[in-house]
Amino acid sequence: MNSESREDMAINSIKLLAGNSHPDLAEQISKKLGIPLSKVGVYQYSNKETSVTIGESLRDEDVYIIQTGIGEQEINDFLMELLILIHACKIASARKITTVIPNFPYARQDKKDKSRAPITAKLVANLLQTAGADHVITMDLHASQIQGFFHIPVDNLYAEPSVLNYIRTKTDFDNAILVSPDAGGAKRVAALADKLDLNFALIHKERQKANEVSKMVLVGDVTNKSCLLVDDMADTCGTLVKACDTLMEHGAKEVIAIVTHGIFSGSAREKLRNSRLSRIVCTNTVPVDLDLPIADQIDISPTFAEAIRRLHNGESVSYLFTHAPV
């Protein structure tokens, strides 16, 4: 059997399932792989219990379940939906079950940062494994140590290659400087700056309580520069907006915010609408409809589609850490 026939046979044994969290992304991954989504019904009873039905055989199949951590419904509903889907595939005799979770739920609760605090990201890892998951694919975990919470393989893909392409082709690249909005993201931004051969700056923020920034101090010169403010996620956008103000006050020409996970909860949209940002860019790891003239999006469905193809065929995914498939 030649390699082409072997690959065709392998692809035919993939089953793609999708929950309700991000149907658009699931459809894009499906189209790029050339594999239709399997028939799945997800319903809620009147008492809000979730019920799942799978409309075709999964026996001895390599199953990939696409379900991101955030959507139009509550995060806990999507998590429970995912767990039930995994369990349904398990008892349907699937050979292998891989969960594709572009935005990992509870990723910010990754450590015991105060007395009696739970490590909820570890709990989610336990739940996924108990339900029957054999492998996890995700992107830009808020804390990379979450991979160590699992006893099964975890592939933490990077949005970085796609972000690099965006910066090179859709920004004032020659006059740009990369900026980290906090010390925690400095390593990420420094790595990007090295690859782009650009300078970078850092904003040190002092918090009084969660989601509330009291003071920001800029380290670096941004005068007359196009500032590319890079972070892994934007939630309430308080940090991004205040960081933008700080940069503009220090003479920046413009500020473009680029994030992997655009959560945009609470009053985030209103903050962005009234901000001095020239552009807010996010990937489609979560469903986003900002309806703002300054909004732009990076499609990461090719990365997930290629990861699925490579994993299924037993190929390395390390190529995706440095290259963005099209």
From Swiss-Prot:
UniProt entry tagged with the keyword Secreted: no
InterPro entries referenced in this protein's UniProt entry, alphabetically:
PRib_PP_synth_CS, Pribosyltran_N, PRibTrfase_dom, PRTase-like, Rib-P_diPkinase
- CC per GO annotation: cytoplasm; ribose phosphate diphosphokinase complex
Catalysis: reaction(s): D-ribose 5-phosphate + ATP = 5-phospho-alpha-D-ribose 1-diphosphate + AMP + H(+)
Q: Which residues bind Mg(2+)?
A: D140, H142, H151, D155
Q: Which GO terms describe its molecular function?
A: ATP binding; kinase activity; magnesium ion binding; ribose phosphate diphosphokinase activity
Q: Does the keyword Metal-binding apply?
A: yes
Name its GO BP terms in alphabetical order: 5-phosphoribose 1-diphosphate biosynthetic process; purine nucleotide biosynthetic process; ribonucleoside monophosphate biosynthetic process
Q: In which pathway does it act?
A: Metabolic intermediate biosynthesis; 5-phospho-alpha-D-ribose 1-diphosphate biosynthesis; 5-phospho-alpha-D-ribose 1-diphosphate from D-ribose 5-phosphate (route I): step 1/1
Q: What is its EC number?
A: 2.7.6.1
Record's Gene3D superfamilies?
3.40.50.2020
Which PROSITE patterns does the entry mention? Answer: PRPP_SYNTHASE
Q: What is its subcellular localisation?
A: Cytoplasm
Pfam families named in the record: Pribosyl_synth, Pribosyltran_N
Q: Which UniProt keywords apply?
A: ATP-binding, Cytoplasm, Kinase, Magnesium, Metal-binding, Nucleotide biosynthesis, Nucleotide-binding, Transferase
Which top class of enzyme applies to this chain? Answer: transferase
**What is the similarity comment for this entry?**
Belongs to the ribose-phosphate pyrophosphokinase family.
NCBIfam families membership:
PRK01259.1, ribP_PPkin
Additional comments on file? Answer: Present with 5280 molecules/cell in log phase SD medium.
**Function according to Swiss-Prot or TrEMBL:** 5-phosphoribose 1-diphosphate synthase involved in nucleotide, histidine, and tryptophan biosynthesis. Active in heteromultimeric complexes with other 5-phosphoribose 1-diphosphate synthases (PRS2, PRS3, PRS4 and PRS5).
Q: What is this protein called?
A: Ribose-phosphate pyrophosphokinase 4
Name the source organism.
Answer: Saccharomyces cerevisiae (strain ATCC 204508 / S288c) (Baker's yeast)
- Please name the taxonomic classification of the source: Eukaryota, Fungi, Dikarya, Ascomycota, Saccharomycotina
Q: Which gene encodes it?
A: PRS4
